[in-house]
Amino acid sequence: MHVFYTPDIAQTLELPEEEAGHCLRVLRLGVGEEIMLTDGKGCFYRAVISAATQKRCVVKVVEKTEQEPFWKGHLHLALAPTKNMDRMEWLAEKATEIGFDELTFLNCRFSERKVIKTERVEKIVVSAVKQSLKARKPVVNEMTDFRRFMEREFTGQKFIAHCYEVEKPLLRDVLRKDEDAVVLIGPEGDFSPEEVALAAEKGFQAVSLGKSRLRTETAALVAVHLMNLTHAE
């Protein structure tokens, strides 16, 4: 069954314009056909198309199902984006398929990219939510300066994965199940010493992702996978 993202389905029984176009013009579905909706907030809706025009698709909800969370705690990934945006789009897709709650792009001292089109990333995340049959959509935040991000209050565990030669435990060994967790991943040139010091001052624990040398997007995906595996029900 085809899945469509309808964040406001509780207020209006109509697909968003872009989803309606995909449903009616691309997939050529019509009145009377059954579809599945997700609001991205934890619920699936089995629905039937009740009216359709060139740009509008009205539905009748037949059944609402709340999807139990696959993990407990809030899983937050914050990273400095790579210069090649394709790699960040790949990460957004794969991390969503695995499962996490929030994505923040960081503007660090050695960042290769200072601007992110979050609308594009948002579309990729929505597509991955539908493809992987998840009822919850990760939040995608606008790019934030590293120092400003450090001013935020975080509950639970806080980690920074950097490459400086200091003693660091493996992330997998210090993650605690059911607790909120935020992991910071730096740019290809790593975090600056000042950023590492500031993070430590704010209570972020330095961790290792293993012995391999990883690209930014690979390190980020490893972090998401470890958080998900630790917190999964």
Residue ranges of predicted features:
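N-terminal positively charged helical leader segments and presequences
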Residues: 1-66, 119
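A generic structural signal for short beta-strands and their flanking turns/coil linkers
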Residues: 11, 31-33, 43-45, 55-57, ...
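Generic structural signal for residues in well-ordered beta-strands
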Residues: 59, 137-141, 206
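Short, ordered loop/turn segments at secondary-structure junctions
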Residues: 64, 108-111, 211-212
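RNA substrate-binding interface of SAM-dependent RNA methyltransferases
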Residues: 68-160
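Active-site/ligand-binding-proximal alpha/beta "capping" segment
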Residues: 159-197, 204-211
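Structured adenosyl-cofactor binding patch, chiefly the S-adenosyl-L-methionine
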Residues: 193-233
